[in-house]
Amino acid sequence: MTETNQIFRCNVCGNIVEVLNPGAGQLVCCNQPMELLVARRTDVGPEKHVPVVEETGTGIRVKVGEVPHPMEENHHIQWIEVIAGDMVYRKDLNPGDNPEAEFPVEMASDFMVRIYCNIHGLWY
């Protein structure tokens, strides 16, 4: 059984999917079950992976890590996502970009931030 906003990855081709509508079936890609990614806060380099949230005049700014995460071709943050109530905001990033993004979410509201590193996976 899948749940809304879960993230799955294909360990063969690298496809990543986010569940929009939960269902009873198993997600399969390349003839293999997809791996459920579990966001973490500790492990390899938390100082470069844990999102840091700051208030701005129009919402929040999310920076990836207390120490800015590398944004190189072979190691970078692919996206930053904020889930606030029934809204999902996502900023796709590319090598060379700054590992940060701004979102129109009030700091006082209830929200969740997560990021995806192409090497070290999902973080919150």
From Swiss-Prot:
<feature type="binding site">
    <location>
        <position position="120"/>
    </location>
    <ligand>
        <name>Fe cation 2</name>
    </ligand>
</feature>
<dbReference type="GO" id="GO:0016491">
    <property type="term" value="F:oxidoreductase activity"/>
</dbReference>
<dbReference type="Pfam" id="PF06397">
    <property type="entry name" value="Desulfoferrod_N"/>
</dbReference>
<keyword id="KW-0479">Metal-binding</keyword>
<feature type="binding site">
    <location>
        <position position="13"/>
    </location>
    <ligand>
        <name>Fe cation 1</name>
    </ligand>
</feature>
<feature type="binding site">
    <location>
        <position position="30"/>
    </location>
    <ligand>
        <name>Fe cation 1</name>
    </ligand>
</feature>
<comment type="similarity">
    <text>Belongs to the desulfoferrodoxin family.</text>
</comment>
<dbReference type="GO" id="GO:0019430">
    <property type="term" value="P:removal of superoxide radicals"/>
</dbReference>
<dbReference type="InterPro" id="IPR038094">
    <property type="entry name" value="Desulfoferrodoxin_N_sf"/>
</dbReference>
<feature type="binding site">
    <location>
        <position position="29"/>
    </location>
    <ligand>
        <name>Fe cation 1</name>
    </ligand>
</feature>
<dbReference type="InterPro" id="IPR002742">
    <property type="entry name" value="Desulfoferrodoxin_Fe-bd_dom"/>
</dbReference>
<dbReference type="InterPro" id="IPR004793">
    <property type="entry name" value="Desulfoferrodoxin_rbo"/>
</dbReference>
<feature type="binding site">
    <location>
        <position position="10"/>
    </location>
    <ligand>
        <name>Fe cation 1</name>
    </ligand>
</feature>
<keyword id="KW-0249">Electron transport</keyword>
<keyword id="KW-0408">Iron</keyword>
<dbReference type="InterPro" id="IPR036073">
    <property type="entry name" value="Desulfoferrodoxin_Fe-bd_dom_sf"/>
</dbReference>
<dbReference type="GO" id="GO:0005506">
    <property type="term" value="F:iron ion binding"/>
</dbReference>
<feature type="binding site">
    <location>
        <position position="75"/>
    </location>
    <ligand>
        <name>Fe cation 2</name>
    </ligand>
</feature>
<protein>
    <recommendedName>
        <fullName>Desulfoferrodoxin homolog</fullName>
    </recommendedName>
</protein>
<dbReference type="Pfam" id="PF01880">
    <property type="entry name" value="Desulfoferrodox"/>
</dbReference>
<dbReference type="InterPro" id="IPR051233">
    <property type="entry name" value="Desulfoferrodoxin_SOR"/>
</dbReference>
<feature type="binding site">
    <location>
        <position position="69"/>
    </location>
    <ligand>
        <name>Fe cation 2</name>
    </ligand>
</feature>
<dbReference type="InterPro" id="IPR004462">
    <property type="entry name" value="Desulfoferrodoxin_N"/>
</dbReference>
<keyword id="KW-0813">Transport</keyword>
<feature type="binding site">
    <location>
        <position position="49"/>
    </location>
    <ligand>
        <name>Fe cation 2</name>
    </ligand>
</feature>
<feature type="binding site">
    <location>
        <position position="117"/>
    </location>
    <ligand>
        <name>Fe cation 2</name>
    </ligand>
</feature>
